[in-house]
């Protein structure tokens, strides 16, 4: 079998190259052909082989391979609705790792994925509770890739939130810190219960994640990003996170509170994002039932 040729080191180099190139060509050409290849070889396939096949693809056709990874990221988030579904723990673990949780999905509206500890050391959990998430949906995903030094990925997540007793207490506390006497910047009583109950407790939010080439001395994407020992494909990037909400008091915090207003727009540099789990949902058919459409990787 072709995959066996990849795994037996005693075979001649020309034979290995031929087998690897054949697998690579099929895997990076389209989503449908990638799944067909992995289904045909599922008995012998593992993450190490996926990384090696994609690394070979990167060395022969870097742009097509990166577009394959980005297409897998987009498909998993938008079409498979990874953030919205109730995930089977064992299937999730097969793609993302046994110790991973839903908060580890990149991106999502969680303390970890928002890098709140970077911006709010010591109070990151409180900031996360202020934006109480009940539901989140990936509402937009676009990307363009020219080279490791010229690319952009834009992902928009819409959230439905509801202020509960915990988040209400935190919002009040932050608002009271804006000025003395519990008055907000508009002079109104910031702890009026009517602002946090009933329908007014519900709100929507939009989080826009923009990924661009890394700065600050961080390495750009290369063949070294395909890391077999850690079972990861590390995508280095800066990420800008912009936030808007529909709630009056949250917006007041985003505009006037010295701490919370940092949430409105933040730039985080030199971060690493593992794209392998999104691609292995194709390999292992982790979230079945699941239909792959013949989307060419270079079309976004």
UniProtKB/Swiss-Prot annotation:
Lineage in the entry? Answer: Bacteria, Bacillati, Mycoplasmatota, Mycoplasmoidales, Mycoplasmoidaceae
Q: Which InterPro entries match?
A: Lipoprotein_3
Protein name listed in UniProt: Uncharacterized lipoprotein MG439 homolog 5
| N-palmitoyl cysteine: lipidated positions | 20
Instruction: Write down the membrane topology.
Output: Lipid-anchor
Q: Does the keyword Magnesium apply?
A: no
Tell me the leader sequence span: 1-19
The record, for Pfam families, names: Lipoprotein_3
Similarity field: Belongs to the MG439/MG440 family.
- Organism equals Mycoplasma pneumoniae (strain ATCC 29342 / M129 / Subtype 1) (Mycoplasmoides pneumoniae)
Q: Covalent lipidation (S-diacylglycerol cysteine) residues?
A: 20
């Amino acid at each position: 079998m072709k995959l066996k040729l990849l795994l037996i080191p005693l075979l001649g180099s020309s034979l290995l190259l031929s087998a690897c190139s054949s697998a690579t060509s099929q895997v990076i050409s389209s989503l449908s052909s990638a799944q067909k290849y992995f289904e045909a070889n599922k008995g012998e396939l593992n993450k190490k082989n996926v990384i090696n096949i994609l690394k070979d693809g990167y060395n022969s056709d870097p742009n097509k391979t990166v577009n394959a990874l980005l297409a897998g990221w987009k498909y998993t988030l938008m079409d498979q609705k990874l953030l919205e579904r109730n995930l089977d723990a064992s299937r999730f673990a097969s793609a993302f790792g046994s110790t991973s949780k839903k908060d580890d999905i990149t991106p999502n509206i969680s303390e970890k994925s928002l890098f709140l500890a970077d911006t709010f050391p010591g109070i990151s959990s409180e900031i996360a509770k202020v934006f109480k998430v009940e539901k989140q949906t990936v509402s937009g995903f676009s990307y363009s890739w020219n080279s490791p030094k010229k690319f952009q990925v834009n992902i928009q997540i819409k959230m439905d939130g509801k202020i509960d007793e915990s988040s209400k207490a935190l919002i009040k506390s932050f608002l009271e810190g804006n000025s003395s006497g519990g008055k907000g910047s508009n002079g109104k009583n910031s702890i009026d219960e009517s602002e946090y109950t009933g329908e007014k407790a519900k709100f929507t939010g939009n989080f826009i994640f923009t990924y661009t080439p890394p700065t600050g001395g961080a390495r750009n994407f290369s063949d070294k990003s395909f890391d077999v020992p850690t079972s990861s494909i590390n995508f280095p990037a800066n990420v800008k996170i912009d936030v808007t909400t529909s709630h009056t008091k949250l917006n007041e915090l985003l505009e006037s509170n010295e701490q919370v207003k940092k949430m409105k727009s933040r730039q985080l540099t030199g971060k690493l994002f593992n794209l392998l789990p999104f691609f292995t949902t194709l390999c292992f058919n982790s979230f079945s039932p699941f239909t792959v459409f013949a989307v060419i990787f270079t079309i976004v």
